[in-house]
From Swiss-Prot:
Organism of provenance: Acidothermus cellulolyticus (strain ATCC 43068 / DSM 8971 / 11B)
Start and end residues of each Glutamine amidotransferase type-1 domain: 296-545
Residues noted as binding Mg(2+) in the record, renumbered to the chain: 76, 145
Gene name of the record: pyrG
One of the Pfam families matching this protein, by short name: GATase
Entry keyword annotation includes Amino-acid biosynthesis: no
Family: Belongs to the CTP synthase family.
Additional record remark: CTPSs have evolved a hybrid strategy for distinguishing between UTP and CTP. The overlapping regions of the product feedback inhibitory and substrate sites recognize a common feature in both compounds, the triphosphate moiety. To differentiate isosteric substrate and product pyrimidine rings, an additional pocket far from the expected kinase/ligase catalytic site, specifically recognizes the cytosine and ribose portions of the product inhibitor.
Protein name, per record: CTP synthase
Length: 558
């Protein structure tokens, strides 16, 4: 029997500045390697001291991406899942907080046998265990993105661990990819390489020499500049990759492929590979850049000043557009602007559909309710997600049933009509008697759909699984009243105790649907989520005159 090939490790580092697109570069390379027939998994090492981003301010961190096993992770894990078209788990995101918590717990249990616990070897060994834990019999390549920028104090233990991994598994089994910035200086009309040179020098100071450099720039990089980077940073000229700003993130795999990055990596690591078949990806890009139709979808949210707070929602909308051969123009609507009927009418004027995403806290809630009342009364296709479902129920209770003051106990503990209430197992958290972090209803849970409902039609089955992140639920004491007034409870947990989906009948509204889950987390560009596909289809039909929907099915993964 042939010996199993050693799992290869590819580390992605960043230099000069943050937000260069390390995650997208790593995701796109993973996409290319998978298209070449390799089995790829990915991991993000985050240098912050938080255990996870679950309690971090969305304005600072962006969205929290929840995996099937309930881990609250960095938004880059969402990029990994979408580009690899695979489900990852909590081991895909490692933070300094997790590492130190684990090491300190082991020290308290006496596992270090009286050793003086230090960054080297104890912290670095813990990091290495997490990295090597991603390898396995069914994995050819582990791509590990090291967060932060080379030179940051917080990143040093992760870089040292990566250096040691190379020493332990062999240099032929490890590849270091450095993503750096080539800034353009207007007065001189030049792309400058010096920041990248200093960045690579800083990397060398910790014992790492990059095998390839991805040069980010806002304009094409001339051959003489690439040659200079090659010479001064001591990498092969073919390993200097030009990554100019792309119109769409889904262009990046083709950009990197055209530069030869994937071919260089597989040759350098001695991996077997096949050629990439671009047929289906090209059709996806055609729908991205030259769609047959366009729709405008309003996103009514609390954190619209930072679009990354809703990254997966936006990508799910775009994927729903791809499925319908439609471009999606997102109108960012701060929920506060919709508190009055006039404000909602102005903010939502001429939109073809609305999505009300998740969130926490009372700020902006009355605006979400105002937006939902406007879309319900005016027949505008609407999709509610998590908090969006709760707001749909509150708005319906107030304005259809007539329960004045109906609310969620999250926003008004003294409400006379608590149509949304704290889940039983969350009472101690809300009361402050348990930790807040990592204690919500997290991860993938099943739901049973009601036959002949819109969600049943969209999913095409009666049992589904979706990812969740919430503490509050529809109060069962009001379910009978809600249903009697016309709100359809179209999906529940298998035991019937938790409301998972609500909708209005199509005889009343063309598309008014909400879920307690976060379906955006399971959407892929090549496998759009049915709820978002349905929203975009309804938005196209809502336009006047209706646009013919003669599109082919969305392309599947290569």
């Amino acid at each position: 029997m042939a010996a199993r090939q050693q799992t290869k490790h590819l580390f992605v580092t960043g230099g000069v500045a943050s937000s260069l697109g390390k995650g997208l570069t790593a995701s796109s390379l993973g996409n290319l390697l998978k298209a070449r027939g390799l089995r790829v998994t990915m991991q993000k090492l985050d240098p912050y001291l938080n255990v996870d981003p679950g309690t971090m301010n969305p304005f600072q961190h962006g969205e929290v991406f929840v995996t099937d096993d309930g881990a609250e992770t960095d938004l880059d894990i969402g990029h990994y899942e979408r580009f690899l078209d695979t489900d990852l788990n909590g081991s895909a995101n490692v933070t300094t907080g997790q590492i130190y918590s684990s090491v300190i717990a082991k020290e308290r249990r006496g596992e270090y046998l009286g050793d003086t616990v230090q960054v080297i070897p104890h912290i670095t060994n813990e990091i290495k265990d997490r990295i090597r834990g991603m390898a396995g019999r069914d994995v050819d390549v582990v791509i590990t993105e090291i967060g932060g920028t080379v030179g940051d104090i917080e990143s040093l233990p992760f870089l040292e661990a990566a250096r040691q991994i190379r020493h332990e598994v062999g240099r032929d089994n490890v590849f270091f990819l450095h993503v750096s910035l080539l800034p353009y200086i207007g007065p001189s009309g030049e792309l400058k390489t010096k920041p990248t040179q200093h960045s690579v020098a800083a990397l060398r100071q910790v014992g790492i020499t990059p095998d390839a450099i991805v040069c980010r720039a806002d304009r094409p990089i001339p051959p003489n500049v690439k040659k200079k980077v090659s010479l001064m940073c001591d990498v092969d000229e073919e390993a200097v990759i030009s990554a100019v700003d792309a119109p769409s993130i889904y262009d990046i795999p083709k950009v990197l492929h055209a530069e030869g990055l994937d071919a260089y990596v597989v040759r350098r690591l001695g991996l077997p590979f096949r050629d990439v078949d671009w047929t289906q990806w090209d059709e996806l890009l055609r729908r991205v850049h030259d769609p047959a139709n366009r729709v405008t979808i309003a996103l009514v949210g609390k954190y619209v000043d930072l679009p990354d707070a809703y990254l997966s929602v936006i990508e799910a909308l775009r994927a729903g557009g791809i499925a319908n051969d439609a471009g999606v123009d997102v109108r960012w609507v701060a929920s506060d602007t919709c508190e009055t009927p006039g404000g909602a009418a102005k903010a939502l004027q001429n939109v073809d559909g609305v999505v009300v995403p998740g969130g926490f806290g009372v700020r902006g809630i009355e605006g979400k309710l105002g937006a939902l009342r406007y879309t319900r009364e005016n027949g505008i296709p609407t999709l509610g997600l998590c908090l969006g479902l709760q707001c749909m129920v509150v708005e319906f209770a107030r304005n259809v049933i007539g329960l004045a003051g109906a609310n969620s106990t999250e926003f008004d503990p003294a409400t006379p009509y608590p149509v949304i209430a704290t889940m039983a197992d969350q009472m101690e958290v809300v009361a402050g008697r348990r930790d807040m972090g990592g204690t919500m209803r997290l991860g993938s849970y099943p739901a049973i759909l009601a036959p002949e409902t819109l969600v049943h039609e969209l999913y095409g089955c009666l049992e589904v699984r979706e990812r969740h992140r919430h503490r509050y639920e529809v109060n069962n004491a009001y379910r009978q009243q809600l249903e009697a007034a016309g709100l359809v409870i179209s999906g529940t947990s298998p035991d019937g105790q938790l409301v998972e989906f609500v909708e209005l009948p199509r005889s009343v509204h063309p598309f008014y649907v909400a879920t307690q889950a976060h379906p955006e987390l399971r959407s892929r560009p090549t496998r759009p989520h049915p709820l978002f596909t349905g929203l975009i289809r309804a938005a196209l039909l809502h336009r006047c005159p209706p646009i013919p929907l003669d599109t082919e099915p969305v392309p599947t993964a290569r």
